[in-house]
Amino acid sequence: MITDTSADFMDLLPEVPQPQKGPVFTYSTPEMPWLRRTLIRTVERLSGRAGFERLYRNWQQKPHNAEDSIFTQAIGELGLTADISPEEMGRIPETGPLLVVSNHPYGIIDGLFIGHLMASVRKDVKLICHSLLCQPQEAQDALLPIDFGAGPEARRTSAETRRKAVEWLDEGHVLIIFPGGGVATSVTPMARNASDFEWHPFIARLARRPGVKTLAIYVAGRNSRIFQVASHLSYALRVALIFFETKRKMNKPVTVRVAEPVECATMGKGDVVAWLRARTYAMAEPGGPEADYVFNFPPRINV
């Protein structure tokens, strides 16, 4: 005689992914002071975050082409198109360890778009990005989180990502990183161009590894004047506007320049970062940002 229990029966059922609680996309965290958290969520809500949540939920219900990367699916949902020459697209190596470095003019769009370009050529792509953008379950295999928090858990997360990044390259894959670590910003609120923060020296460790080729990419453009002014007033207001800036760029082309891949293994550690930054900004449009311009938050800004 066969006996059965409800527990045994439940064990036979296929696992069903549970919906994530709370907003999937937000730059706020429960650990933030109440005022900062409230400001970020309020501005995000007013500037389009809910639309991205709906876009994501609707996308989850659609059938997907298994051959398309998460990056390609995302830019399809956002209506982004590529403005890049076939010659420069052909510079992406099809095999071997590849470090991709780029300026960071927009925020979310930059990572998705460069991820899409790389995934159009090869499938072994990972992107280092802000940990708060790693919430969608479907994207987690393609992302390596950097936690910008100040606590020990944040430091552990970032240290683990650095270890995995080195390992990923050593295994012969593609790693995308924005060495500035934050969205490009005008040096003064009304300046014409937006520049990256100082590039992080960690990329020298990656670029100088034996056999690694480094591909410099320049993404043209900048965020709105509203974002630039906000960045000189409040860090919380700045990050809260990222979804507004992403919405502004939807259904538009993204202009990208790609340099020839290079090997940096024989370069001095102190030279690599500045050289790669200069190589990236050398592809800027006439009158565009220059490598020597570096944005830093005013002392009054509490990051």
Model-predicted regions and their roles:
Residues 2-101, 111-113, 120-124, 249, ...:
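Membrane-anchoring hydrophobic helices of lipid-metabolizing enzymes
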Residues 89-93, 135, 188-189:
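A short beta-turn/loop motif at secondary-structure boundaries
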Residues 73, 113-116, 120, 167, ...:
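Residue-level signal for well-ordered alpha-helical scaffold segments within enzymatic catalytic domains
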Residues 2-6, 158-303:
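Non-catalytic C-terminal accessory region of glycerolipid acyltransferases
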Residues 75-80, 104, 151-156, 192-194:
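Short, flexible loop segments at the rims of nucleotide/cofactor-binding pockets, characterized by
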Residues 81-90, 129-133, 162-165:
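Short, charged beta->alpha transition segments
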Residues 50-54, 99-154:
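Catalytic core of membrane glycerolipid acyltransferases/transacylases, capturing the structured
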Residues 98, 123-126, 142, 165, ...:
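Generic beta-strand structural signal
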